[in-house]
Amino acid sequence: MSAPASSAPRLRLRVSKAAELHIRDGHPWVYESSVREQNREGEPGELAVVYDRRDRFLAIGLYDPFSPLRLRVLHTGMPTQLDDAWWAARLDAALARRAALFGPLTAFGDTDGYRVLNGESDGFPGLVVDRYAGVLVMKLYTAAWFPHLRRMLELFAARAPDFAVVLRLSRNIAERAADLGLHDGQVIYGELAGDSVVFRESGLRFEAEVRQGQKTGFFLDQRENRRRVEGLSEGRRVLNAFSFSGGFSLYAARGGASEVTSLDISAHALRSAERNFALNPELSAVHKTVQADVFEWLPAGKGSGADYDLVILDPPSLARREAEREGAIRAYGKLAEGGLTRLAPGGILVSASCSAHVSAEEFEEAVMSAVRRSGRRWRKLLSSRHAPDHHASFAEAEYLKAVFLQMD
């Protein structure tokens, strides 16, 4: 996986007319099937130049010969040199956007857990960086970033020298990482004692399993929806289904819920939720945990009298590929139907989806179909999308959606 010799000609690509149009419209991906000409074989992470049919400069991107997503666009417009200053300016632009939301990178305020780099939408395609207090978690989704890893570490070390950096890898590149002596969960800069980090979100303390947890250790993308739930929880009995480590549960408790139930099939997740409550002893709400399959548990309790005033349905992705889309849409409807059976009159249903293959319109219609079948009157409180640190700059990056409904 070495870089090509310096004497090798620049890697040049020509792409289909449709791909040209997509690039000009700001889309950051070029698929293998769209490459029409290539002057030579390329190595992972090479900077390849894309030309249009008239031999005019179109883009520069990261090349990955092992992925059907062959090129991830870094720059379009006029030709430029992607030197150290270019990379530094791009990172600083992303950090400035976060500073407007959370303060400087090295500040420790009410929220020191957030997304620092959101892949393509921040101009770093195939790379995300999340911050948890004094730890940065860098997750790679393409082998094209391996040759640039040292550069990224140097850039962050110059801006946050006391932070540790943990490397996380998508499954598809783990084997190639091993060839380079890298592995998922590896501390590649600084020091980290243990596998977990305690960070703050809106003043609440949470534990993130940064070396082996889901995503980068916590579901940071639901922060704004957690805040919304907090504002709706006073005096309510709250059910947090697919609770994972209890994010919604803690916000509901701080919002004045009378009791909160965290429901998840994973005993490990429920233990994590209990640890997070222990980190926040000021929360007075009764917290219960239930280990069960949500799809089975919700309808099984119909008519039991164990009703809730606020039900949160936040499952993991139900469609990881396009072939699973129709089944996921049906599953979202089934979940909403089950949640409604446990929702008391006047209660609030919060349904969320993180499946990129299911559009916001398809998801909301699945939920609303279940609502209409229930025969209950309803009022839509709001629909929500991405948090500002998880902004999406192109259609495929839009995955998160939620709908808040109040039922009679």
Swiss-Prot record:
Protein name, entry field: Ribosomal RNA large subunit methyltransferase DR_0049
NCBIfam families reported in the protein's UniProt record: Rlm_2499C5
Reaction catalysed by this enzyme: cytidine(2499) in 23S rRNA + S-adenosyl-L-methionine = 5-methylcytidine(2499) in 23S rRNA + S-adenosyl-L-homocysteine + H(+)
E.C. no: 2.1.1.-
CDD domains, alphabetized: AdoMet_MTases, PUA_RlmI, RlmI_M_like
Biological classification of the source: Bacteria, Thermotogati, Deinococcota, Deinococci, Deinococcales
Major enzyme class: transferase
Keyword Transferase in annotation: yes
Family indicated by similarity: Belongs to the methyltransferase superfamily.
GO biological processes: methylation; rRNA processing
PANTHER family, per the entry: RIBOSOMAL RNA LARGE SUBUNIT METHYLTRANSFERASE YWBD-RELATED (PTHR43042:SF3), SAM-DEPENDENT METHYLTRANSFERASE (PTHR43042)
Known role: Specifically methylates the cytosine at position 2499 (m5C2499) of 23S rRNA.
Pfam families reported in the protein's UniProt record: Methyltrans_SAM, PUA_3
Key words, A-Z: Methyltransferase, RNA-binding, rRNA processing, S-adenosyl-L-methionine, Transferase
GO molecular function, one term: methyltransferase activity
